[in-house]
Curated annotation (Swiss-Prot):
Protein name, per record: Allophycocyanin beta chain
NCBIfam families in the record: apcB (TIGR01337)
SUPFAM superfamilies: Globin-like
Source species of the chain: Anabaena variabilis
Subcellular location: Cellular thylakoid membrane
Gene3D superfamilies in the cross-refs: Phycocyanins
PTM annotation (N4-methylasparagine): residues: 71
One Gene Ontology cellular component annotation held by this UniProt entry: plasma membrane-derived thylakoid membrane
One record GO biological process: photosynthesis
């Protein structure tokens, strides 16, 4: 996993070439959204707990999953769910800043689906909560930054599905 800049430079370096027009355009696009990504990350970092709390309220709180017999019924399981969702939000933010979703493969998704299945964690409910995080985040950071952040949250959802 590497950031967008390193990926472009390494590609040219492996070929022993200077950056071509296409590579420079990729860098230009990355830098042109830099301020937007940093502003979004600042807002997300300052509001992470509230984002996760609101996303859980929107997607999971009043469903069967939190009632007796449900997978999130017990404080310990509920806390584990909150912890996982916070982790996904944090790593999606890192990936957004880097401009590269492959960070998520290595740090989040490798073996996660298998682990969830072996522990009986409902993947569908998790994906639903991640989509709620996407919605809450977009309402907080604005449409353009929300769309950018959504790329990385969708990447996690797809990796779990």
């Amino acid at each position: 996993a590497q950031d967008a800049i390193t990926a472009v430079i390494n590609s040219a370096d492996v070929q022993g070439k200077y950056l071509d027009t296409a590579a420079l355009e990729k860098l230009k696009a990355y830098f042109s959204t830099g301020e937007l990504r940093v502003r979004a990350a600042t807002t997300i970092s300052a509001n992470a707990a509230a984002i996760v709390k609101e996303a859980v309220a929107k997607s999971l709180l009043y469903s069967d999953i939190t009632r007796p017999g449900g997978n999130m019924y017990t404080t310990r399981r509920y806390a584990a769910c909150i912890r996982d969702l916070d982790y996904y939000l944090r790593y999606a933010t890192y990936a957004m800043l880097a401009g590269d979703p492959s960070i998520l493969d290595e740090r989040v998704l490798n073996g996660l689906k298998e682990t969830y299945n072996s522990l009986g964690v409902p993947v569908g409910a998790t994906v639903q909560a991640i989509q709620a995080i996407k919605e809450v985040t977009a309402s907080l950071v604005g449409a353009k930054a929300g769309k950018e952040m959504g790329i990385y949250l969708d990447y996690i959802s797809s990796g779990l599905s």
